[in-house]
């Protein structure tokens, strides 16, 4: 897909993987909607790339519908959706005070899995009504999972489950949407230098980077963005999850 003047939505687009992707899409000629719960950061990113900023809880059905309507009004209907919005927590199933509460588990699954599906379903419905481009293509959806979907560590039950759900829905949805010319892909990043990791002490960042076989460092958000753009440009990539992790396999803890 040629991205020039194509409307694209990036959730979690104010920073990190989403921020790098929003910038890369804009540099490729796309009209980008930055969706994020951080209003100020979303506005700053939108101003930087010449896009629009929209505040939205991705797991809220009504808010998401309003966000898509706002994007269509400002940029036209989107042919590209990149889901980068996500949260994480660390909690053992059984702790010193007994079983962990459900609220933390529910929040992570709600944002990471339900939020991704919510945005995908609305994007797909909109894309299915658009005129077909080359090869009958109408749109591309890229979800973000994690290597935790495969190598979840102790304390990552909620996060790993939510990301495994994203991986699990990729193929069946891609098969379903194939009739419309809509592709669905997922990227499963390893250890990337996102705002969360940037907040850690330098020695911990170095230790985490050293655990990656090659390249022996943390991934850069721009490398995620580069893969997202490659997926958009290569129509044979469909229904698959790509690990972007430098051959890293996480230890139990």
Question: What do the predicted segments below correspond to?
Answer:
Residues 146:
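Residue(s) in the substrate-gating loop at a strand-loop-helix junction
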Residues 125, 174-176:
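Alpha-helical segment proximal to the catalytic Tyr-Lys
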Residues 87, 98-118, 142, 166:
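Catalytic Tyr-X3-Lys loop
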Residues 88-106, 125, 129-135, 155-158, ...:
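Conserved mid-core segment of classical short-chain dehydrogenase/reductases
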Residues 178, 183, 237-240:
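Short, small/polar-rich loop/turn modules that mediate ligand/substrate recognition or access, typified
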Residues 120, 162, 170:
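Active-site helix of classical SDR
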